Amino acid sequence: MKPELEKLCADYIANRDTVGKVFKWDSNDLYTVCANVFCACGQTADTDRLKECREVIKKHTRLFSKFRSKKVRSILASMLSLVEKPEERMTLANDYFSLLKRHFKGTEYLVLTAFLLADLADQTLTEETALRGKQIYRRMNQKHRILTNKTDSVFAMLMAFSGKSEDELTEEVEAGYLVLKKHFSNSGASQTAAQVFSMTGGLPEEKAQRLNDLYDALTEAEIKYGHADELAPLAALSISDTPIPTLVEEIKEADEFLKDQKGYGTKEDELKKRALHAVMIVSDQYQGTDQVNVTLMTNTLDMLFAKQQASRFSFAVHVVEALLKMVAASHEGKEETKVETDNKSDAQKQPEE
């Protein structure tokens, strides 16, 4: 392993653990995203700085603000800790959020979008750009109503800042999607990957085919890489012009490093997660690391919402089961009472001998 990659691997683990100490009750998956935010900038997470930025978020928001949500607060604090004036950045993100809320639902996805746009030093969010983002999102929804969700609103706004027309963006996303969906069973993941490609130069079909080739090369190298939420980060890495064999070798080296670290098991899902984190680390060396981080943030939000819904569903099932048992018990009690009453009635009706 080359020294640069080895350092990134070590920094990733250190950053993950530092964020975990500050946000003890948040999801482990968020710690990994935050760790890569720091690695992508060549910075190290600092406990005191993170705590300071957590207070900045509280200072500039109300009690039940989406900015304080456990699904995003660690990511936001990490991003704030990297800028010289976090209070100014927080104010700008708040202003952007207010503007975006006129066109999109005020969810954690929109909070994340506002922060990402506030990080674009050479761009300014205007009413016109927000409307353009909304129009791009509507086009996505019209084209693939079932596949399009809140995650796509983040990409729609980022796409709105590209120099391409709405027609060009829509056509490129569709062209890339058609190539990818022949190769991968997850249509939603294919659409997100195609959106990542639309924000870069080159022919969409060629970019999609390069992703197919990279994925196949990972499979041949016996690296367990998923093709659901994991696909978009791999697409962002594939934007790099680094030869595929080099990327595969580095991903394998990072994967081997993570194998010996705390938090990685041997189940299939855990192997896929480990490979995803290896891709994250490798991407920090190349063009496309910003897109990797965006896909990681949105995918992690999706996962956290899915877990929340599953938890609510599980709770609802338990409640229903308990109610059914109560009804059944009540019914049995009534039946027993009825039997006893009938027996007494029969006994009273029997003639004396």
Describe each region flagged by the PLM.
Residues 40-48, 82-88, 120-127, 164-166, ...:
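Short coil/turn connectors between adjacent alpha-helices in alpha-solenoid helical repeat scaffolds
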Residues 1-91, 98-112, 281-284, 305-331:
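N-terminal domain-start signal
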Residues 209, 213-353:
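C-terminal structured domains
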Residues 13-16, 48-60, 88-100, 127-140, ...:
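Alpha-helical repeat scaffolds
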Residues 122-126, 138-268:
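A contiguous, surface-oriented mixed alpha/beta subdomain in the mid-to-C-terminal portion of proteins
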Residues 2-4, 15, 26-29, 46, ...:
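Serine/threonine-rich low-complexity intrinsically disordered regions
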Residues 2, 7, 21-24, 51, ...:
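Context-gated lysine
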Residues 30-40, 70-81, 108-119, 151-160, ...:
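Amphipathic alpha-helical elements of HEAT/ARM-like alpha-solenoid repeat scaffolds that form extended
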